[in-house]
Amino acid sequence: MNKTWQISVPGSTANLGPGFDSIGLGLSLYLQLTVTLQDTWAIIHLDDNGPKEFELEEHLLYVIAKKVAEQYGQQLPACRVEMASELPLARGLGSSAAVIVAGIELANQVCGLGLSVQDKLNLSSQIEGHPDNATASVLGGLTISSMDEKGNVDTFHINKIDASFVVYIPNVELKTSESRSVLPEQFDRAYAVHASANANMLAASLMARDFQRAGRYMEEDLFHEPFRAKLIPEYSEIRTAAKKNGAYGTALSGAGPTLISIIPSTIAGDFVQTMKKQFPEHQVIVTKADEQGIQVREYMKRLL
């Protein structure tokens, strides 16, 4: 009998328009790990949403777990890790943040680190470089966060969001580094004030659960979407069609290329069917806000 852990981490969307690098939302699309202690390391991907070929020492999950264990003075024991993911790579659905959060939790469990939720928020955000996706994967729900120069994260968290979300996933990858390369190095003061005001209105509307207004401000970003739009397949067409069919608003999911709409849950079925017909080159999926964040179950497993 070997000790085994099942670790579930929600994917996420970041920004929701003008909430650049600070607003995140956990989604009901998951990275699932089954981790079993054994004599040698093995990482097995059970689907296509993972690297097809890799060296163990370069796999992000292993790199993060080993780094965290060593940071706390522990040696990471060998494990068999089976990974199943609903998060396509480089599509703007928090796949890398989910693996980072999973790696931290793997080290926490197999090394008995006893990490607090705050520890996980800090570690994951420091590794990611910003707290939007990381906090959403740790906590679930809506997160509005700030990280100081020492890497300490402060998060406002709402776990229940009474709306549905539709993602439009194109069959192309877009690396975050490429998407960041088109952004300006600086803005003038008046532009920055306007952009910040829109971000403030988005955050306030989400906190007030005023999704009509939140949807409006999702489409009023000035920090990144005007510059990234040219990289995104059917960016304007999807936004226009979504609004026509009843969406509150549509924005890039993270750095793209996926787009995400917030919609009333009552129209979800008809909305998705209509958008699928209009955009057959995209995978159109309705999802909800995850309300729990990272989940862990421990049990004993008999190895054959």
Curated annotation (Swiss-Prot):
Pathway participation: Amino-acid biosynthesis; L-threonine biosynthesis; L-threonine from L-aspartate: step 4/5
Pfam family, one: GHMP_kinases_N
Disulfide bonds: none
Gene Ontology molecular-function annotations: ATP binding; homoserine kinase activity
Listed Gene3D superfamilies: 3.30.230.10, GHMP kinase, C-terminal domain (3.30.70.890)
Family: Belongs to the GHMP kinase family. Homoserine kinase subfamily.
Protein species of origin: Lysinibacillus sphaericus (strain C3-41)
Record keywords, A-Z: Amino-acid biosynthesis, ATP-binding, Cytoplasm, Kinase, Nucleotide-binding, Threonine biosynthesis, Transferase
SUPFAM superfamilies, per database record: GHMP Kinase, C-terminal domain, Ribosomal protein S5 domain 2-like
Principal cellular location given in the protein's record: cytoplasm
Name this protein carries in UniProt: Homoserine kinase
Entry superkingdom: Bacteria
Binding site for ATP: 88-98
Task performed by this protein: Catalyzes the ATP-dependent phosphorylation of L-homoserine to L-homoserine phosphate.
Stored InterPro entries: GHMP_kinase_C_dom, GHMP_kinase_C_sf, GHMP_kinase_N_dom, GHMP_knse_ATP-bd_CS, Homoserine_kinase, Ribosomal_Su5_D2-typ_SF, Ribsml_uS5_D2-typ_fold_subgr
Compartments reported by the entry: Cytoplasm
E.C. number: 2.7.1.39
Membrane listed as a keyword: no
Gene giving rise to this polypeptide: thrB
Catalytic activity: L-homoserine + ATP = O-phospho-L-homoserine + ADP + H(+)
Annotated coiled-coil segments of the chain: none
GO biological process, one term: threonine biosynthetic process
One Gene Ontology cellular component annotation held by this UniProt entry: cytoplasm
